């Protein structure tokens, strides 16, 4: 079995943060549109009171940038 690369770790973290947002939106009865997901992630990333790992921050920024290009 090969060791996961940094890209693999980033991709898994991106999937985790997007999945979390989508499930939370579903629980609130909201439709998870890509522009709304990006907005939720921007707001969460701007919250300085929550400590995040460097990987989580990078994943959130990468997802925001990818969704902004859509």
From Swiss-Prot:
Coiled coil: none annotated. Signal peptide: none annotated. The keyword Lyase applies. InterPro entries: FumD. It catalyses: (S)-malate = fumarate + H2O. One of its GO terms (molecular function) is fumarate hydratase activity. It holds the Pfam family DUF2767. Its EC number is 4.2.1.2. The keyword Iron-sulfur does not apply. Disulfide bonds: none annotated. Keywords: Lyase. It comes from the Bacteria. Belongs to the FumD family. In vitro catalyzes the addition of water to fumarate, forming malate. Cannot catalyze the reverse reaction. Cannot use the cis-isomer maleate as substrate. This is Fumarase D. It comes from Salmonella typhimurium (strain LT2 / SGSC1412 / ATCC 700720).
């Amino acid at each position: 079995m090969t060791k996961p690369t940094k890209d693999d770790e980033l991709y898994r973290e991106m999937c985790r943060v997007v999945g979390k947002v989508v499930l939370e939106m579903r629980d609130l009865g909201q439709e998870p549109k890509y522009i709304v997901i990006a907005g939720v992630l921007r707001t969460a990333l701007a919250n300085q009171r929550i400590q995040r790992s460097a990987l989580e921050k990078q994943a959130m920024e990468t997802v925001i940038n990818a969704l902004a290009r859509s």
